[in-house]
C-alpha cells in the first residue's frame, strides 16, 4: 500500500529519500531535463511503497498562494499521482490559492481534483484549484 509523507524543503531526510531519483537520468528526462529544486519555502509530498519512493510532489509556498511544479511519479502511475494530489489538497486546505504547472498528459488527473486550466503551452498546462 502506498503511503504519503510530508517533508520540509531543507530537511536532511528529504535528500536521503529523493536524491536517488532526482539524480537519475531517466527521472530528469521525464522532467524534460529540468533540475529539481527546493528551499525552506517548499514542502515535499512523497509517495512511498514498500520503503521505495514512487513519486513526489513539491509545493512551494509563496505570498500569492502555493504552487505545485516539477513533480514525478514512477511509471507515470495515475493512481500515485492522484494520491499525491489528494494529500496536497488535504494539507493545504481551501483557504490558500493553489496553482499547478502540469504535464499535458496529467491534466485530466488534476481536473479530477478540481483544477481548471489557466494557460496552455506545448508540454505543460498552468492550472488553478477551482474555489
Model-derived segments and their meaning:
Residues 76-93:
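Conserved acetyl-CoA-binding loop-helix of GNAT-fold acetyltransferases
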Residues 23-48:
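Active-site rim helix/loop that mediates acceptor-substrate recognition in acyltransferases
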Residues 103-122:
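Conserved active-site alpha-helix within GNAT-family acetyltransferase domains
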Residues 91-104:
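Conserved GNAT acetyl-CoA-binding A-motif
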Residues 48-50, 126-130:
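Active-site beta-strand termini and strand-to-loop segments that position acidic
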Residues 60-76:
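Conserved acetyl-CoA binding element of GNAT-fold acetyltransferases
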Residues 46, 51-60, 67:
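Conserved beta-strand in the GNAT
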Residues 1-30:
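Short amphipathic alpha-helix that is part of the acyltransferase structural core
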Amino acid at each position: 500500500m502506498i503511503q504519503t509523507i510530508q517533508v520540509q524543503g531543507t530537511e536532511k531526510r528529504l535528500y536521503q529519500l529523493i536524491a536517488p531519483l532526482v539524480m537519475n537520468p531517466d527521472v530528469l528526462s521525464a522532467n524534460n531535463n529540468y533540475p529539481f529544486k527546493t528551499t525552506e519555502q517548499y514542502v515535499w509530498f512523497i509517495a512511498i511503497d514498500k520503503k521505495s519512493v514512487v513519486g513526489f510532489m513539491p509545493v512551494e509556498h509563496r505570498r500569492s498562494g502555493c504552487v505545485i511544479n516539477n513533480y514525478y511519479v514512477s511509471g507515470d502511475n495515475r493512481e500515485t499521482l492522484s494520491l499525491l494530489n489528494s494529500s496536497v489538497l488535504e494539507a493545504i486546505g481551501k483557504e490558500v490559492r493553489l496553482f499547478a504547472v502540469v504535464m499535458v498528459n496529467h491534466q485530466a488527473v488534476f481536473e479530477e481534483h478540481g483544477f481548471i486550466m489557466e494557460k496552455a503551452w506545448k508540454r505543460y498546462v498552468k492550472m488553478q484549484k477551482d474555489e
